[in-house]
Amino acid sequence: MLNDGMETPRDIIINRMMGMKRARIIYNPTSGREAFKKHLPEVLQRLEQAGYETSCHATTGEGDATKAAKIAVKRRYNLVIAAGGDGTINEVVNGIAEQQYRPKLGIIPVGTTNDFARAIGVPRSINAACDILVEGESVPIDLGRVNKQYFINIAGGGRLTELTYEVPSKLKTILGQLAYYLKGIEMLPSIRPTEVEIEYDGKLFEGEIMLFLVANTNSVGGFEKLAPKSTLNDGMFDLLILKKTNLADFIRIATYALRGEHIRDPKVIYAKANRIKVQTHDKMQLNLDGEYGGLMPGEFVNLYQHIEVFVSKDKAAKMKKKS
């Protein structure tokens, strides 16, 4: 059913009495060259055939997906589906994460890089993503919180993390992770390292860095092995610190990162941590799930199995085996 989700109190009571499941799709109408809008009737039909009373909301600008998710929580939807890129998913998560009642989360990846969807094994095909929503399984996963904001995939700081919004969307679509690699080489000569203090689970790093990453998954900026030991539901972040480097160092480390071998490089610190505190001596932007998240400093806290997300049955079985 295509509507704006404005149920009356009577509708909500009747639906609950009938035991009907309710799904709310929050979608970015501009993502993926507006491809999702063309498939929306099919998606609604699939969900309704699976027993969901379904409605949708098209976002109108920055922050709107967060507002829409908060409304969906208030109206006690069983499932909230984020259809868009990593930015849309991040906004939806920020609307759900701080609430006492948290609906299950579904993902339809129609953005450019779709890092989080790749990490949980949700394919780019809209039909295949719908298969997971109606035939898959929901599993609890960790979330990250920093400075009263939430992230589901990655947080970081340092000029190199700004690659995610420096690289044009068209170039990301055509070249994938190579676009980040090339942009990094272009930017590096003009980048000055930043002096930081990073505390992580009783340890302390002090020195100049090019970037730091706080990862919840293994998929970052199109690189699927940047945090190779990452687990979504273990209550731990993967912390990656790239020390001061020159161009030759960067090219070597980026090449190793394609194979997940960068974590052994002497210019890289890689560790597991539940809580990470970062202090900076200079101005440093905070990047949350590929979007601008304000300025550092910040304290990153892992929220253990804080939200349930739909994945394929195979992926769910693997995650349960690891936990």
Residue ranges and their predicted role:
Residues 171-179, 228-248:
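Gly/Ser/Thr-rich active-site loops/lids in small-molecule metabolic enzymes
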Residues 87-101:
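Short Gly/Thr/Asp-enriched flexible loops that form oxyanion-binding sites at enzyme active sites
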Residues 2, 7-80, 316, 321-323:
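ATP/NTP phosphate-donor binding region
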